[in-house]
Amino acid sequence: MAKKINPIKFSEDESAHDSIIEWWYFNGNLRDEEGNRYSFMNCLFKADVKKVKIPFLSRAPFKNIYFFHSILSDIKKKKFYPVVDYISVVSRDSFKKPLLFINHTSPILVKGYLNRSLEETEKFSYRLKDDNLDLKMVSTKRPLLEGGEGHIEVCGRGSHYYSLTNLKTEGEIKIGNKIIKVTGKSWMDHQWADVSYSKDKWSWFSIQLDSGVELMCCEYSDGKSKSYLSDIVYSDGRQESLKGLELIPGKNIWESKKTKTKYPLAWEIKLKEKKISLKVSALIKNQEIIFGSINYWEGPLEVAGVIDGRKVVGAGFMELVGYNSDYGNIDYIKNELERVAGYFLASPKRRLRRMFKRLR
């Protein structure tokens, strides 16, 4: 008998769920007052420690663990500033308000106490704060229920999934000691599922066209089969799940010096049914995130192409996960694993009590 799929309800389902894995993800393309370009990614993960089966997290002394990844990129200077926290401490009042509210920090105080937060100030309006940004975002369209109903199936695995595809954004970013005012457009994903970690591979794209059209495209592979997903939001807000997606990697390949992973940084996206043909290319080559034994590429795109005979341009984001890695630096892996272990072996209870006091 097929498992009943509960429809997504707002605002209840913006909060946390009793699932194996869950994340609240944002990306965006921004400009300052001089027209200089920047991008960001911000993602807080929640995982059931025993069931998610991520190797280096399995010994953590909690039921659920939170961890945090973010990137701020300076497009002109071709530099990116990643932050990876293997564990985040969430405050007691998180998920306790009528609208989404998460307050968290790192238990490792390298640069002093720093508070990070995601707060829904009004329905589908958010304030996002982390190490390098303080942004206000307002959704101009209703949530995109991915897959048509907010539930997707990839290679036999089910997941609840919705997106806010057009978030009008303004605020500040911080590079070094410099505070920069910015405006732009952001994208939000919220996904939760009862699936364990696996070495599956996926190539994911969020596209925001200047014409007001947004597009999500994904190819997912478990090594035996592939699943393709594509959803579109039209300029008038209509939504549609599309079939026949083709994702064709180009010849622009970047090889990581750390992991030896080869990432294709240019792609062609085709949906013949809707006469969509888009070419996307990365704005910065090195956007690799390393999380223990897991590495992935995440970064901004420029987009150009044709929809139904009309030329279109825009911006986007790409995520490449599960691409073959051939670590050549054993010492680097050893240091990473030792750093992860340090989170849990150095008086974890005393350290966590101190963090909870700060977050009360």
Roles of regions detected by a PLM:
Residues 1-360:
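Structured soluble/peripheral alpha/beta segments that form catalytic or ligand/cofactor-binding pockets
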